[in-house]
Amino acid sequence: MKAILCSQYCQPDDLVLADVPDPVAEPGQAVIAIKAAALNFFDILMIQGKYQIKPPFPFSPAAEVAGVIESVGAGVTDLKVGDRVIASCGHNGAREKIALPANSIVKIPDNLDFDRAAGIIIIYGTALHALEDRASPKPGETLAVLGAAGGTGLAACELGKLMGLKVIACASSDEKLEFAKAHGAELGLNYAKEDLKEGLRRLTNGKGADIIFDPVGGTYAEAALRSIAWEGRFLVIGFAAGDIPKMPLNLALLKGCDIRGVFWGNWARLNPEKNRANLEKLVAWTAEGKLSSHVDRTFPLAQTADALKVLAGRKAMGKVILHP
């Protein structure tokens, strides 16, 4: 089968399309014939050796896949050949087939296409865990989403609206804000034109946002924290800006607020049943049209480098998908 391989830490253009042996389903596993693999920003960091998870070489990028069950190993009873499924794989999704533990695979309905299905797991899984499990939101509270037109940010906008929150999209262009407003945001703040701290105070009539969802980091994090409401919750999702901010902890004291880390991957590993229930709920909501799982663009497997460069250049609004 064909696979995109990273054999040493490198840039996207250094990845190689190669032939590798087909996987075999061991006991408790199933082999998925991959129809769509979703890329995330951390895939770039992973191939560069800058991510906290460092798979052994050679490995493939792409941590979430959708496809069809091709074979099952001994002891697997809840999956059968031909089932349409999604799964989170951590890495190795940029290939034609993959063997995974059967208990990590979730079925999808016929009315949910593979491209949209592949993009559900990580961004919506992260956003749902962040908002539902870490933020403990109350209906009517204000949610400010940084990087609101990116994958995780867009998921937070949609889920925030479903939870009855007042969503403020924060992004670097008016085009991105309009996109976020079409996906659940009520208000928008262009932080390329207006100071983020002052803008959030203005849009909340001086109170500040109750929940701040930050997948961006960099200089925006402190500005957002300075605008947070009393007893607000600041959710640390990631650092797409590249810089990990150093936050003055006196702000947490003065605001009576919480700074809460969100590491969906580790939480999912430690809470597999709750994570599975979350994914099944997200699949149902997407199939029902309550969530968009918007796909920005697709690429054939051989053009994985081009797909990663779209993410690196902040050009995607929604998911970037590979077709093996």
Question: What are these regions, as identified by a protein language model?
Answer:
Residues V283, E288-R297, A305-P324:
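C-terminal capping/lid region of NAD(P)-dependent oxidoreductase domains
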Residues V145, K161-Y220, E273-A277:
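Adenosine-nucleotide cofactor-binding segment
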Residues G153-L154:
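N-terminal Rossmann-fold NAD(P) dinucleotide-binding loop
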Residues P21-A38, K50-N92:
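Glycine-rich beta-strand-centered segment in the early N-terminal region that forms part
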Residues K2, V16, P21, A33, ...:
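Residues located in well-ordered beta-strands
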Residues A33, L45, S71, R84-A149, ...:
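NAD(P)H dinucleotide-binding glycine-rich loop of Rossmann-like/cofactor-binding domains
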Residues T219-L291, H323-P324:
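Glycine-rich phosphate-binding loop and adjacent beta-alpha segment
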